[in-house]
UniProtKB/Swiss-Prot annotation:
Molecular function GO terms recorded: palmitoyltransferase activity; protein-cysteine S-palmitoyltransferase activity
Catalytic-site annotation from UniProt: C134 (s-palmitoyl cysteine intermediate)
GO cellular component: glutamatergic synapse; Golgi membrane; mitochondrial membrane; mitochondrion; perinuclear region of cytoplasm; postsynapse
Domain notes: The DHHC domain is required for palmitoyltransferase activity.
Listed name of the protein: Palmitoyltransferase ZDHHC8
Domain (DHHC): residue spans on this chain: 104-154
Compositional bias annotation for Pro residues: 408-417, 511-521
Region (Disordered): 289-350, 362-423, 436-537, 551-574, 626-684, 707-744
Similarity remark: Belongs to the DHHC palmitoyltransferase family. ERF2/ZDHHC9 subfamily.
Biased composition (Low complexity): 626-644
Membrane topology of this protein: Multi-pass membrane protein
């Protein structure tokens, strides 16, 4: 009757065993008290001795069968049966003495039951050599306690026979006084013994047969070996010997000894010797960015160096905008090099600065004026130095000019324009040279584009090796402001140049320049040709550098404005809409008014018509057309809502400020000089091409319209009005009747990078 510690006590299952024990002990006691004294005097004193010894043997076997472990197999742990799949077969066959015996999977105990093993539904355990569950002993009868159960049956049967026999003898001798107490009690004991004698004798005989045949009650009832051969039999004598004389089987389940818990915990719950030996170190940043706290003993701490932990390379110094700009303009007179170069520091870099090379600290070139010449060491040729533009070259980004009230805004802060035409041409050559070094490799011959009929310009400059972006940084700050060469050459405005010059395709050619390939034709119907994006963006420059450029630009522009005697002819061009019948008639025509230029919408032919623009040789007109063509050729287009909002502002009766509607916030209120071109801008990865225009020989407008039928567009409406209503009157513009596209006799060619060519009727 072993019970696991977690099982609940059920009184009902103890009723049979309590009844059996009470009957056994009660009847035997009454027999020994009322019957045995007379038997001892009348028959023999050996009768009480025999019955007493037999009673003790019955009681001992009963106790062993009740409280002994029958041979319970322990259940499998959760991690023990992981190898057995839940889809494993329900049965497995094993060979026992050449005979296959089936083993069944136990879903409760999670293992295959050994042969002759069965799961007891009452005890809920798998018992080895399971015979049956006996309620009279409240225990399973298995391999370990079957011997005691069998002996209990044998001894109980003998004891019951003795009690009934000796009781009957007492009654027969006291038949005259059946009403006496001793005779009545003896008759009651005989009735109890006789009542249980038949089932006990029957059960004992059944188990005698099973023992002699080598079977269990479970095997006999289920008929496992019925009509077959029993592989577990050892013969009659061998089976009896195995049951009665074999050594006791081991116990598989051992309850842990219950020992009192005598553990005293101290408040810190830490061993003091560990605190003395272990000294925690500072938190160290591992290579993967995780913080790891390490501890070492005092002995190892004595051998540590005094240098601090390596937490990565130091961050670059932060320089305020005012100090940085002042150092650029006034170099320190302490050394000769400081007079020729500007101290440049690395701007703050992103979080991955560990994997990006630092900026170069080579010799720098100061800003070169028109009449200054800076001597310097010998330099390499331009073709060799073009190969130094390797990886990690940041692509600067020029921002698009801000639009008007209804227009678009660039997503990045606007970049200020460069100071002079020399700086502008130097920046353009930097863009072209970097694109050529990426595509061509070493000693690549750069073929510039040529603008037919354009006036010659003296603004040609060269880049020294240190003026180009090197492999260790992005486009330097000096390359934006200092296009001059430190290699002993003259400034860009001087005609005497020592080495082979490179002509940018974005500048007007000189009289001695090689001929350029003719521009390719363009058809708006077929769509534009694929163009390569500009390789340069200025969005990687730090805000400190850009702020200093803006500050210097504003100061020099104000000084130039004081010296300038003429007002600005025009501002930045408007934004052209998509090439459709609606948008081909929209162009930006600027006429000079009392306070500045007035923006006017008309056809594309109105752009270059009239005497107000000074003819085809006007460089300001060419710059305006370049900005217009670049705005027409970039994608994505501006929305119609922003264009109509600009038109509504332009249709106002009063004149507008001279700065135009499309100005960046940094340039509002500052009219540009007449001949100073404005730097185009790049936003994100958009490519804007610099387009040069020229005026070829006069051609009939009818031929142009026949070649390009898409220019013949029906009249469209702007803001609900016809194109004629949308334009300003003759009083606001000196164009007069020349605004009609049907009266022009010239064809204007607008060519750009990538083979894009526009023809505009003049």
């Amino acid at each position: 009757m072993p019970r696991s510690p977690g099982t609940r006590l059920k009184p009902a299952k103890y009723i049979p065993v309590a009844t059996a024990a009470a009957l056994l002990v009660g009847s035997s006691t009454l027999f020994f008290v009322f019957t045995c004294p007379w038997l001892t005097r009348a028959v023999s004193p050996a009768i009480p001795v025999y019955n007493g010894i037999l009673f003790l043997f019955v009681l001992a076997n009963f106790s062993m069968a009740t409280f002994m472990d029958p041979g319970v197999f322990p259940r499998a742990d959760e991690d023990e049966d992981k190898e057995d799949d839940f889809r494993a077969p329900l049965y497995k066959n094993v060979d026992v003495r050449g005979i296959q015996v089936r083993m069944k999977w136990c879903a409760t105990c999670h293992f295959y039951r050994p042969p002759r093993c069965s799961h007891c539904s009452v005890c809920d355990n798998c018992v080895e050599d399971f015979d049956h569950h006996c309620p009279w002993v409240n225990n399973c009868i298995g391999r370990r306690n079957y011997r005691y159960f069998f002996l209990f049956l044998l001894s109980l049967s003998a004891h019951m026979v003795g009690v009934v026999a000796f009781g009957l003898l007492y009654v027969l001798n006291h038949s005259e006084g059946l009403g006496a107490a001793h005779t009545t009690i003896t008759m009651a004991v005989m009735c109890v013994a006789g009542l249980f004698f038949i089932p006990v004798i029957g059960l004992t005989g059944f188990h005698v047969v099973l023992v002699t045949r080598g079977r269990t009650t479970n095997e006999q009832v289920t008929g496992k070996f019925r009509g077959g051969v029993n592989p577990f039999t050892r013969g009659c004598y061998g089976n009896v010997e195995h049951v009665l004389c074999s050594p006791l089987a081991p116990r598989y389940v051992v309850e842990p000894p219950r020992m009192p818990l005598s553990v005293s915990l101290k408040p810190p719950f830490l061993r003091p010797e560990l605190l003395e030996r272990a000294v925690p170190l500072k938190v160290k940043l591992s290579d993967n960015g995780l913080k790891a706290g390490r501890s070492k003993s005092k002995g190892s701490l004595d051998q540590l160096d005094e240098k601090p932990l390596d937490l990565g390379p130091p961050l670059p110094p932060k320089i305020e905008a005012g100090t940085f700009g002042r150092d650029l303009k006034t170099p320190r007179p302490g050394s000769a090099e400081s007079a020729l170069s500007v101290q440049r520091t690395s701007p703050p870099t992103p979080a991955m600065y560990k994997f990006r090379p630092a900026f170069s600290t080579g010799p720098k070139t100061p800003f070169c004026g028109p009449n200054e010449q800076v001597p310097g060491p010998d330099s390499l040729t331009l073709a060799d130095d073009s190969t130094h533009s390797l990886d990690f070259v940041s692509e600067p980004s020029l921002d698009l000019p801000d639009h008007g009230p209804g227009g678009l805004r660039p997503p990045y802060p606007p970049s200020p324009p460069l100071n002079t035409t020399d700086a502008f041409s130097g920046a353009l050559r930097s863009l072209s040279l970097k694109a050529a070094s990426r595509r061509g490799g070493d000693h690549m011959t750069l073929q510039p584009l040529r603008s037919e009929g354009g006036p010659p310009t003296p603004h040609r400059s060269l880049f020294a090796p240190h003026a180009l972006p090197n492999r260790n940084g992005s486009l330097s700050y000096d390359s934006l402001l200092n296009p001059g060469s430190p290699s002993g050459h003259a400034c860009p405005t001087h005609p005497s140049v020592g080495i082979a010059s490179y002509h940018s395709p974005y500048l007007h050619p000189g009289p001695s320049d090689p001929p350029r390939p003719p521009p390719r034709s363009f058809s708006p119907v077929l769509g534009p040709r694929p163009r390569e994006p500009s390789p340069v963006r200025y969005d990687n420059l730090s805000r400190t550098i850009m702020a200093s450029i803006q500050e210097r630009k504003d100061r020099e522009e104000r000084e130039r404005l004081l010296r300038s005697q003429t007002d600005s002819l025009f501002g930045d061009s408007g934004v052209y809409d998509t090439p459709s019948s609606y948008s081909l008639q929209q162009a930006s025509v600027l006429t000079e008014g009392p306070r500045g230029s007035v923006l006017r919408y008309g056809s594309r032919d109105d752009l270059v018509a009239g005497p107000g623009f000074g003819g085809a040789r006007n460089p300001a007109l060419q710059t305006s057309l370049s900005s217009l063509s670049s705005s027409m050729s970039r994608a994505p287009r501006t929305s119609s809502s922003s264009l109509q909002a600009d038109q509504a502002n332009n249709n106002a009766p009063g004149p507008r400020p001279g700065s135009g509607s499309h100005r960046s916030p940094a340039r509002q209120g500052l009219p540009s000089p007449p001949g100073t071109p404005r730097s185009p801008s790049y936003t994100g990865s958009k490519a804007v091409a610099f387009i040069h225009t020229d005026l070829p020989d006069r051609q009939p407008s009818l031929a142009m319209q026949r070649d390009h039928p898409q220019l013949k567009t029906p009249p469209s409406k702007l803001n609900g009005q016809s194109p004629g209503m949308a334009r300003l009157g003759p009083a606001a513009s000196p164009m007069g009747p020349n605004a009609s596209p049907a009266r022009h006799t010239l064809v204007k060619k607008v060519s750009g990078v990538g083979g894009t060519t526009y023809e505009i009727s003049v």
